[in-house]
């Protein structure tokens, strides 16, 4: 009986800690598939979201402020630049210091979908489920 409790506790801790660590290079293709079916020329959200990652001007503004770069909204149509923009955005907002825990794939997807605090918003859960399905 004494061994059952520690083994049960170990199983519980492992089950609770199965969230996958953030790997932006693996996450971006899944985001792209969900956002636009990998269409680099896509325009969505009534003309406000551009490219395969459906990047808004607000994201461009944040990235330029963070890095001092001069991305234009039209750069979102360039797949290489779109990836750079996404990586910069997530590397700034999806950090252990900011979130209070090690960033996960879920955090990254939900921040991409819902903004800097998207990881807390119920409205981003269904988006995460779509991204998670693409990651499998």
Task: Show the residue positions of the predicted features.
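Sec-dependent signal peptide recognition
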Residues: 2-9
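C-terminal motif of bacterial Sec signal peptides marking the signal peptidase cleavage site
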Residues: 14-15
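Signal peptide cleavage region of secreted peptide precursors
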Residues: 18-21
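A short, acidic/glycine-rich surface segment
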Residues: 39-42, 96-97
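Short, solvent-exposed loop/turn and secondary-structure capping segments
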Residues: 42-44, 122-124
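Post-signal-peptide N-terminal segment of Sec-exported extracytoplasmic proteins
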Residues: 43-54
